[in-house]
Each structure stands twice: as C-alpha cells, then as structure tokens.
A protein has these predicted regions:
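Short glycine/threonine-rich loop-to-helix capping motif typified by GTGT followed
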Residues: 265-274
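Anionic-ligand anchoring segments at beta-strand to alpha-helix junctions in alpha/beta enzyme folds, i.e.
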Residues: 285
Length: 324
C-alpha cells in the first residue's frame, strides 16, 4: 500500500531481517553535500539576561530568567550546575535526572561538586524508557564520585526536571531553582523544543525542597506554594481551573481556555474540557501526539482541537486559563 500511494519503485525497497534502527537517519542527515534538501541550520542564540559579566547567581537575583530551547542556548543550564559545583558559597545541589547525553557535562559537574565537598543528591530514574542501562551506569558513577543517589518512589516514575542549589549569602541561605520541560541533555536540547526557568523565588525554592524531601521519602507536603505535582495534586488543579471557566461561561461572563501539550489522554480532564466547550467556553488546544477523541468520551463533541508536524520534537506544555 505504501509503495502504491507514494509511487515507489520496487527497486527502491530493501528487505532486512529484524527491526530497523532508525538512529542511522541522524548520521545520514549529517552527511555533507545535501544542503539543498535540508532545513536551514539554526544556531541557538544567547540569553539576553545573561549577556553581561555578572555571575549567574547575580543575574538570577535580578529577576526570573525564561529559557526557550533550542532557539536559545542550553549553555546557561549547564553553566548553572557547573557554577554551583565550583562556587565556594554553594552548600548543596539536588537534581532529578531522566535522560542525559553520552558525555554529559551535567554528570561531570555533579561529580565535581561532590569532589569539592558539596552535598550532592541526585535522583536517577531507572525506569526511563530505552535508557535503563545508561542510567544504571550513571548512578554507579555518581555514587562512586560521592553523590547521594536516590531512585524515587516505588510504583512511580519521576519525570520532572528540577535542579535546586542551596547557597549561603550575606543575608542568609538562598535557594536557586531551575525547572524545565526537557531533559538535562545538552545534545537533544539542540533538537527538541522546551522551556525552562531560572529563579530564586522563595516560594518556588520551598516547593522544590519539598519535592526532593518527598522523593527521598522524608515527608509528604501538606500544601504547595507555586508548584503542582502529579499524580496527587496536578489533575485536581486543572479540573478546578476548567470548571471555574465553565461556571463563568454559564453565568454569561467571558471564559477562555488555551492549552498546548505533548499528549492528552486523561479522560477526566478531556470530559471537563468538552463540558466547558458545550457551556460556551472558548477552548483552543494543540496536541503533538496523542489525543483521546470525542468517540472515547460519549456525549461530547470536539470544539477546537489541532495538531501539527514540525521539524523538532515539541515537549512544551502550556496552559492559559483566563476570565474576567
């Protein structure tokens, strides 16, 4: 069928034994001499807020820094961890790792931090699909370097990307945090679309500390300041926001929901979105891969769904819920 629909000659088809390793396509794309068939090469740009001579901690204290990869360089994220490893005022570094590159500067910086006498705690997710063996090896290396390695909560996969740096300053201890939608992988950061933020907001720092305490098994937070953490708290917050807009629409007030995500398969949230749309809420969202359609949620119709195919894997998840 594929040959017929694409008008492919039988001489262009090659049969092989076993599954095809598609990673060879990356090497093929890198061959020289075929620039006519390639998209223009994009060079990640520097982050304006960091284009001065101040150290990264000084820049973060000036205000939160939003990062948008690969359009902006991933270097500030690597630099954040590396600076923390070498800064004599830094007391501790805590980080979650899901996937990293083969020769990871992040891993090297964490090992350097431990060697410099800092308290380094790293959650390495051993259930990261296709990277189980790599992550076991990274965990062993980090433990050998003196890092405290943890493996998360039983029955759950830790997919969050968080770095917490605890630093002693003139006015006391300050917590610096990086939150991101993408892995701490300097290679894929050049290909995948992700967002991140560097901040020293005290409430986010407190939440990040609570996340690591929870992942370490020390305690479970009673409440959160800014963060919403799955699987216990995130869905409930989304449902409350969606239902708030539904009530605004039913009362005749403006109501609007915009969302962009990597995948939407939660039927409870999907049902709430359909209910909001039927109540008059303007619902617009884009899903990159998977979407449970109206046929899976009986009684509702889709009122504003779109998907797209682009050059890069887009794993940014955004929600905007607004009303008057």
């Amino acid at each position: 069928i594929i040959r017929r629909e694409l008008s492919i000659n039988s001489q262009d088809i090659f049969e092989i034994n076993g599954p095809l390793d598609l990673t060879f396509l990356m090497k093929m794309y890198g061959l020289e001499g075929f620039e006519l068939f390639k998209a223009p090469r994009y060079v990640p740009q520097p982050v304006p807020a960091l284009m001065n001579e101040d150290d990264i901690f000084t820049n973060i204290r000036k205000g939160d820094i939003l990062l948008h990869h690969p359009y902006q360089s991933f270097d500030p994220v690597v630099g954040f961890v590396r600076s923390a490893a070498r800064d004599p005022e830094v007391l501790a570094i805590k980080q979650t790792l899901y996937r990293v590159s083969g020769n990871s500067p992040i891993i090297a910086a964490l090992a350097e931090a431990a060697d410099n006498g800092k308290q380094v705690s790293v959650l390495v997710e051993l259930k990261a699909r296709f990277d189980e063996e790599n992550n076991i090896n990274w965990a062993k290396m980090l433990e050998k370097a003196g890092c405290h390695v943890i493996y998360g909560l039983v029955g759950l996969k830790t997919h969050s990307k968080i770095t917490l740096v605890v630093r002693m300053e003139e006015d006391g201890i300050r917590r610096y945090v990086h939150l991101g939608t993408g892995n701490y992988n300097d290679s894929t950061a050049k290909l995948y679309t992700d967002c991140g933020i560097l901040t020293c907001n005290p409430q986010i720092g407190e939440d990040a500390t609570a996340v690591f305490n929870m992942l370490s098994g020390y305690s479970e937070p009673l409440a959160w300041n800014k963060l919403s953490v799955a699987p216990l708290w995130l869905r409930g917050r989304f449902l409350r926001m969606i239902r708030r807009e539904t009530e605004h629409a039913r009362a005749g007030r403006p109501a609007h929901i915009m969302a962009k995500m990597n995948s939407l398969c939660d039927k409870e949230i999907i049902t709430a979105l359909y209910e909001a749309s039927c109540a008059g809420v303007k619902v617009e969202f884009t899903d990159d891969f998977n979407f449970v359609t109206a046929k899976d949620v009986e009684g509702y119709l889709n009122k504003g769904y779109g998907s797209y195919i682009g050059q890069r894997l887009d794993s940014v998840d955004l929600r905007k819920v607004e009303s008057v």
